[in-house]
């Protein structure tokens, strides 16, 4: 572990890393140059309490996306102008050839945190992308400085409020990726499927009801509304307090043609104390060629990994669809690899923040 003034510590880390990579691999019968995996730079930013979890995450990610990992946090117990650094390297066999990758842990003093962007630029591998993930406890000063210099910004709107995410998003041109957006793909896909062969019904929506689990963490309804609103050209106009136990109107939007849309949010069973809140159901009230049409995509009470997909009125349908489950390593990998929804997510985040700010 090295600690001290920024320039001295970073110079020492760079020197030690260069020496490690330039020295031959002595684990083989005949010494040979080390083979370094350089698929990306992954920069994870969080609080001191999150460091161990971030380490575990980095190790799991390296199984498929080996490269250089930087774990960055802030510690007000350090000399304000200092930085503490530690690094390690791991080699694993891929056939006959050991593949090696490294990890650098950086803890900044309060004043030194302003230099985080230049430090990261100095320590990252220059010819591959810089992926920055802001963990829920990421200090604002670090996130604000790193967002403009990254090639991709990852966050989790199930843990971080949408207003903060939108604030950071406005400060970067980098593509955005959201763990929660990946987890809720199945719900969005099923909602969008209602309108595959009747797009005119999407323009006639006059009421939206969203059921979600109660809890202290960020409301997942905001991003779902942001996604729908940004796709359909809605303008959010008002938002009031939720109506306990019912589906009372808590907000209003204006459709692209100026027609009013009622928004109702329903509290479902509470999530656990530390659990993320989840979408439990979406109901849309619209019309098709002048006839009322009610659309529903709702989790089954006794099988919450399955949704019931229904149409009533102008059309009729009733199907069951699995929502699926993926572990968090898969979710993170998807945020890194899937590029097709970048613009869609940015627009959804900004619209969700506009709703939440009312």
Task: List the model feature ranges, each with a label.
Residues 5, 9-32, 36, 40, ...:
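C-terminal structured domains
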Residues 184-252:
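ATP/pyrophosphate-binding catalytic subdomain of soluble kinases
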Residues 1-133:
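An N-terminal, globular interaction/scaffold subdomain
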Residues 102-106, 110-201:
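Conserved, well-structured core segments that form the ligand-binding/active-site neighborhood
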Residues 68-78, 132-136, 157-160, 235-251:
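A generic structural motif
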């Amino acid at each position: 572990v090295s600690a001290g003034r920024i320039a001295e510590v970073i110079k020492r880390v760079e020197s030690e890393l260069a020496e490690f990579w330039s020295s031959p691999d002595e684990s083989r019968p005949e010494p040979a140059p080390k083979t370094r995996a350089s698929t990306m730079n992954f920069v994870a930013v969080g609080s001191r309490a999150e460091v161990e979890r971030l380490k575990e995450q980095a190790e799991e990610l390296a199984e498929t996306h080996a490269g250089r990992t930087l774990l960055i946090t802030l510690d007000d117990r350090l000399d304000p102008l200092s930085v503490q650094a530690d690094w390690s390297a791991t080699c694993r066999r891929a056939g006959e050839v050991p593949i090696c990758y490294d990890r650098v842990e950086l803890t900044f003093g309060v004043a030194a945190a302003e230099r985080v962007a230049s430090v990261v630029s100095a320590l990252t591998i220059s010819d591959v992308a810089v992926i920055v993930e802001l963990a829920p406890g990421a200090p604002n000063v670090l996130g604000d400085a790193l967002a403009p210099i990254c090639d991709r910004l990852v966050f989790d709107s199930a843990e971080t409020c949408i207003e903060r995410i939108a604030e950071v998003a406005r400060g970067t041109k980098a593509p955005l990726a959201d763990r929660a957006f990946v987890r809720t793909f199945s719900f969005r896909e099923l909602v969008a499927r209602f309108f595959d062969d009747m797009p005119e019904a999407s323009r006639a929506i006059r009421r939206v009801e969203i059921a979600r689990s109660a809890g202290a963490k960020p409301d997942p309804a905001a991003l779902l509304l942001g996604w729908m609103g940004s796709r359909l050209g809605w303008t959010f106009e008002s938002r009031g307090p939720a109506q306990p136990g019912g589906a009372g109107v808590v907000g209003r939007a204006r459709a692209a043609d100026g027609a009013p849309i009622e928004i109702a949010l329903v509290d479902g069973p509470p999530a656990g104390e530390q659990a993320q809140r989840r979408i439990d159901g979406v109901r849309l009230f619209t019309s098709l060629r002048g006839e009322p049409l009610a659309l529903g995509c709702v989790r089954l009470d006794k099988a919450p990994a399955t949704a019931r997909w229904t149409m009533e009125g102008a059309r009729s349908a009733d199907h069951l669809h699995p929502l699926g489950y993926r572990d968090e390593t898969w979710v993170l990998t998807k945020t890194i690899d899937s590029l097709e929804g970048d613009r869609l997510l940015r627009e959804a985040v900004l619209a969700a923040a506009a709703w939440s700010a009312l």
